[in-house]
Every structure is written in C-alpha cells, then in structure tokens.
C-alpha cells in the first residue's frame, strides 16, 4: 500500500521515490506488471508531465535493463527521450539510454523499432553519445566464446542489418569521435 501511495500520486515530494522505483523498472515489471503498468509507467509519459517524465527517465537511465515485454510498453516514450531539447535535459543519462536503444534493436528485432523515429533519435544525439552507442555494439560483437556469439555471426545477423536500417546517412552528423568504434567493429569481424 505504501509503495502504491508513493508511485500512484503525482505529488512532487514523492518524486525521488519514483525515480528510485524507475531505476528498478525492469525488476518491478517482471514481478508485478499490472501494478507497474498502473502506478509507475504513467510517470514515464512525456505528454502527462515533462518534469516528472524527465526525472523517472533519468532514474531508469542509471542502469537501463529491458526485456521484450517491458520494451513493448515503453518504446514510444523511450524514443521520445531523444527529441530536440529533451536529449540535452537528460544529460549523461542520454548515453546509457542510447546504449539501451542499440540493445533493443539488436536483441528484440528490427521490426520493434520505427525506422524514422530511431534514425531521428540517433541523429539528434551528440557525437560522444553516438560513439558510446557504437562502443556498446563493439562490446556486443566481442562478448562470448560460442557460435551464437561469434563476432561474424553477430555482425551478419544483427549488427549489420541494424546499422543498415537505422544508422543515419547524413554526412553532417559524422565526427572523428565515432571513427574509433567503427574501426573496432571492423577489426572484431572478418
């Protein structure tokens, strides 16, 4: 009951509690999806309250963890984090959310992300955030020792299709900051 009280009302004095709950969103959703849908997820909606949404997305961004069911619930508001203005307000949290965006694309499938919204999100990221996202992808290529995680297999089946579908082609957003992870990707594969 106390948990519901802290989550369910919109009192600003309870916002720090909601931020902490947001940092454990995946865990809470796995334990009780109905309670989470009813009392926590509404605070992630940008159209409801920008200040509240910014706070809980920053909490979620401390250690973002996604599973396919949760992703389906939050992806629209998640992509809205990368709109002009909001991405700057998120500060360093934008980097961890960018990595979570890459993870969602690589692990949940290309069809779960709208192409234009995803390309727009990546385009609006600063070069350091895009480079961090690419470094995360390099890590995804080089983790593991079995066939399922062979870098060439991961490249061919997940990373290359993701890049082809979502990475913006605009030469205006390219930067030297992003060059190193592209090279590391090339070196990790044959």
Predicted regions mapped to residue ranges:
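Non-catalytic all-alpha helical scaffold/repeat segments
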Residues: 1-190
């Amino acid at each position: 009951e106390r948990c519901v009280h802290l989550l369910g009302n919109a009192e600003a004095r309870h916002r720090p509690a909601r931020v902490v709950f947001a940092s454990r969103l995946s865990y809470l959703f796995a334990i009780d999806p109905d309670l989470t849908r009813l009392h926590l997820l509404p605070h992630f909606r940008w159209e409801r309250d920008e200040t509240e949404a910014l706070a809980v997305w920053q909490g979620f961004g401390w250690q973002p963890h996604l599973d396919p069911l949760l992703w389906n619930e939050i992806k629209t508001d998640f992509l809205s984090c990368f709109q002009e203005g909001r991405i700057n307000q998120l500060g360093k949290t934008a980097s961890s959310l960018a990595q979570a965006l890459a993870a969602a694309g690589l692990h949940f499938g290309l069809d779960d992300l709208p192409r234009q919204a995803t390309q727009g999100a990546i385009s609006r990221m600063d070069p350091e955030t895009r480079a961090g996202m690419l470094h995360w992808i390099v890590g995804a290529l080089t983790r593991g020792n079995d066939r399922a995680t062979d870098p060439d297999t991961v490249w061919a089946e997940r990373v290359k299709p993701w890049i082809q579908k979502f990475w913006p082609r605009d030469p205006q957003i390219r930067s030297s900051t992003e060059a190193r992870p592209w090279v590391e990707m090339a070196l990790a594969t044959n």
